[in-house]
Amino acid sequence: MSKIENHEGFKRTFKNHKLTLGLSIPFDSKNKEHIDFNEQVKFAQQAERLGFTSLFVRDNPLYSPHLGSVTENYDPFVFLTYLSAFTSKIALGTSSIVATLRHPIHLAKSSASLDLISNQRLLLGMATGDRSFEFPAFKVDESALTERYQTTIQSLRALWQSHSPNISNSIFELYEDSGLQVLPKHHTIPMFGTGYSRQSMSWLQQHMDGWLFYAQPFQDQKKLVEAWHSGTDRFKPFMNILMIDLSQNPNETVKPIKGGFRTGRKNLLQILKAYESINTNHIILRFTNDDRDIEALIEEVGTYITPHFPAHTI
């Protein structure tokens, strides 16, 4: 068994040929201008109580008015640390950290600290970034993103292994007897490629602990999942984000929307079972409803859907 498979968050969330469910947070509502921290915590605790396996937050360092109305976006490490204080079992994930815009030392220390504080519940989705206005703000050469992403991932592995690693690369050098004072319990934290992150699939299969992708038409996803699992040397989970506009009518038929579906809970269950049948291992649901309360959505899915996809016993 690898060190990753000993990680508590990984063990509860992932198992070959089994599916578990998570939620995208912070929640937002078109009916309310702002959902405060106390309500976010209430929803997180409700999700944990009802058997959801994870909560995933986004990382967008900058906002631009050209993006239009977007969900409030807190610093992912600060927000997840806050949530960790009010939850005990649910995995805490990022979807995803823009790895190319953060210094590896800061990133290694923040993630190690959160993983320890949360009792090894952190799942790190790692992205290259796709907002062109962010790269000049951080003085990052967009043409070098492929190499910078690889260097960051390799640097994190080294920084988590030892208190005094010897590292020399294009981003930083660490020659003296120095390193992180606090290391993760397992000397590693699960990291997941996001999309292709400007890499080949083979690089992701070799260097990442799993793959976080975007919802695809079913047959396309089936081919992608098969290609992913067939090229890894051990079980490395495949997961995706799925947009859901959940009807109050449990029998409503399926209507495709961007990144997911509008449907009732009965067809949603069948959709998720189909994803499980092709060895999708985790799905992060993101509610898009503008006609229902968040609490009611979590309650309905948690009552009728999550019991079919329970967290794995540690």
Locations of the language-model features?
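Active-site mouth loops of central-metabolism enzymes
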Residues: I25-F37, I97-I105, H187-Y196, E252-K266
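Conserved, mostly hydrophobic/aromatic
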Residues: G51, D59, L83, L114, ...
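An alpha-helical appendage that flanks or caps ligand/catalytic pockets
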Residues: M1-H17, S143-H187, Y214-I314
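Flexible, glycine-rich active-site loops centered on histidine and acidic residues
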Residues: N16-I35, A99-I167, D290-D291
